[in-house]
Amino acid sequence: MEDLGENTTVLSTLRSLNNFISQRVEGGSGLDVSTAAPGSLQLQYEQSMQLEERAEQIRSKSYLIQMEREKMQMELSHKRARVELERAANTSARNYEREVDRNQELLARIRQLQEREAAAEEKMQEQLERHRLCKQSLDAASQQLREREDGLAAARETISSLKGRVSEMQLNAMDQKVQVKRLESEKQELKEQLELQQRKCQEASQKIQELQASQEERADHEQKIKDLEQKLCLQEQDAAVVKNMKSELLRLPRMERELKRLREENTHLREMKETNGLLTEELEGLQRKLGRQEKMQEALVDLELEKEKLLAKLQSWEKLDQTMGVNLRTPEDLSRFVVELQQRELTLKEKNNTITSSARGLEKAQQQLQDEVRQVSAQLLEERKKREIHEALARRLQKRIVLLTKERDGMRAILGSYDSELTQAEYSAQLTQRMWEAEDMVQKVHAHSSEMETQLSQALEELGVQKQRADTLEMELKMLRAQTSSAETSFPFCKEEVDALRLKVEELEGERSRLEQEKQALEMQMERLTLQGDYNQSRTKVLHMSLNPASMARKRQQEDHARLQGECERLRGLVHALERGGPIPADLEVASSLPSSKEVAELRKQVESAELKNQRLKEVFQTKIQEFRKVCYTLTGYQIDVTTENQYRLTSRYAEHQSDCLIFKATGPSGSKMQLLETEFSRSVPELIELHLLQQDSIPAFLSALTIELFSRQTSI
């Protein structure tokens, strides 16, 4: 602006000089015409020559001045170009540092992703282990159900055998009824022959006694039928138990279907996780690109701020050894100190990992021992129940054997009475048939008694085996309890480690609850997807293409990493070239992509205009603040100063001393409430505080009363 003003002044002086010369020439010509003196022409010519010489001198001086100014402008332009080159070098160095930081961030993210992938694989292994355990438990349950089915089949066989026996007993009862009818007919025949054959009266009476005995036998048989009916009721109860077991068996395929559905959901969630990871990686890439663009736009604006920050950092570096008490003269010393701290942190982390791994091993061992104790206790209860069942069965069989022996003895007594009372001549065909039937019954009873004895012996043997098994299980339970107690005593931990492990367990439980909540959220999301028209995984087959998106994403990530490394190498070469001060190679000029001089000039102008605007705004703001403070001071009589955050100091214009002030602290949301802090001056006015603040709860009234009191003191003095 000053150069332009000086140029305009030179041009205006030249123009005024030319006008003056033209006016003198015109005035001289008028004198020539009027006077026509021959000597005046020579004088005028000399004057004009002098004026022309002066004009030439002025022009040469102005030209010299202009050349000097152009020289100064060239020097300024050279200085500006040098400053621009230095700034460009600084920006390139900063960009290189940023790229290095970004590469480190990318490497850290890659490590984090690898760690997440390893954690996901561990979780997958844990889930596979859980599925395997569930499968084993299902196999065990199916084995138990098969055993129960075998028991039910055996019970059905016993029921069918008992039904056969009941049918046989019913047939025997029918035969006995037929015999009773036949005996009644014989009784009638004997009554008809009573008058003719008085000798056979005794036989008739004997036959009557036999009939009475047969009636008693029939009553016994009816009692046996009732007993068998009771047994049938018990068998029906057993059948109801069998039915319940069948219903439990019917639940097994539903549980298998649910397990299959959970596995499919797990695979689907893994695929969703992979797609989500790809989308997050793409989103991070886009965010990084957006951040780069924004940083490139804000780089020129932040140059001065970074300069100030660097100066502050330089000062902090110079004061760092004094503040920290560590000999840190250079950044290399700080980097070494940071590396040592990181190594210490790694050692502490390794110790922590070893402690946590040992704690996890102990927890797993304790959990396994607890599971084994539960299993052994459950097996012990089952064996005790089986033993009680076998003991009850043995008691029933013993009762049945006693009844059968009684029946056998009764039948033998009846046959003996028949043999003793009847003679050889009096045997008839009916008696022989009856004898054969009685012998058959005796043989059947013997066979049944032998079967009952074998069953009793088997039941007693099984009872002994079950007792031995129960004893062994009790011994194993005692051994496991002793092992748990020895394990607890063999691993003494200090109280702090136990507390740390408990905290770790609580954190794991919280994580488990969080994972359960996430699982519920994912299940709800799956339900929403199914409502929105998602496909059914049990009916739809998912085809995985040969071009896996995960592998493509990894390949793309590797290419980006290689490209970034190439850019870093090019930027290193550019920085070295700028540090040497030599010419920049062509490939580095292309790679550097520095802005042109016009763009730099425009951006400088924009920066200068923005700085001028900011400076003007600051000046206006300061003036307005000063005016506002003066107005508040004149209107309220108090000067308000901000001491610290949310604390304000009020000094009255009528105060006797400069230290007489009040301090208020802003509390509540957005400083809606003010609290008076205790000072020496506030202790001198307890009456006003009690009246206006405690009773009336009015700060303006308190300030106005204090102003009146101070004003009255000054006027009274």
Curated annotation (Swiss-Prot):
It is found in: Nucleus; Chromosome, Centromere, Kinetochore; Nucleus envelope; Cytoplasm, Cytoskeleton, Microtubule organizing center, Centrosome. The keyword Cell division applies. Gene3D superfamilies: 1.20.5.170, 3.30.457.60, 6.10.250.90. Pfam families: MAD (PF05557). It comes from the Eukaryota. There is a cross-link at K61 (Glycyl lysine isopeptide (Lys-Gly) (interchain with G-Cter in SUMO2)). A motif (Nuclear localization signal) lies at residues 79-82. The modification Phosphoserine is found at S16, S214, S428. One of its GO terms (cellular component) is mitotic spindle assembly checkpoint MAD1-MAD2 complex. The modification N6-acetyllysine is found at K61. Its main location: nucleus. Residues 380-532 are annotated as: Necessary for interaction with NEK2. Phosphorylated; by BUB1. Become hyperphosphorylated in late S through M phases or after mitotic spindle damage. Keywords: Acetylation, Cell cycle, Cell division, Centromere, Chromosome, Coiled coil, Cytoplasm, Cytoskeleton, Isopeptide bond, Kinetochore, Mitosis, Nucleus, Phosphoprotein, Ubl conjugation. Residues 46-631 form a coiled coil. GO terms for molecular function: identical protein binding; kinetochore binding. Residues 540-551 are annotated as: Necessary for interaction with MAD2L1. GO terms for biological process: attachment of mitotic spindle microtubules to kinetochore; cell division; mitotic spindle assembly checkpoint signaling; negative regulation of T cell proliferation; positive regulation of mitotic cell cycle spindle assembly checkpoint; regulation of metaphase plate congression; thymus development. The modification N-acetylmethionine is found at M1. Component of the spindle-assembly checkpoint that prevents the onset of anaphase until all chromosomes are properly aligned at the metaphase plate. Forms a heterotetrameric complex with the closed conformation form of MAD2L1 (C-MAD2) at unattached kinetochores during prometaphase, recruits an open conformation of MAD2L1 (O-MAD2) and promotes the conversion of O-MAD2 to C-MAD2, which ensures mitotic checkpoint signaling. Belongs to the MAD1 family. Homodimer. Dimerizes via its N- and C- terminal regions. Heterodimerizes with MAD2L1 in order to form a tetrameric MAD1L1-MAD2L1 core complex. Interacts with the closed conformation form of MAD2L1 (C-MAD2) and open conformation form of MAD2L1 (O-MAD2). It is unclear whether MAD1L1 dimerization promotes the conversion of closed to open conformation of MAD2L1. Formation of a heterotetrameric core complex containing two molecules each of MAD1L1 and of MAD2L1 promotes binding of another molecule of MAD2L1 to each MAD2L1, resulting in a heterohexamer. This is Mitotic spindle assembly checkpoint protein MAD1. The lineage of its organism: Eukaryota, Metazoa, Chordata, Craniata, Vertebrata.
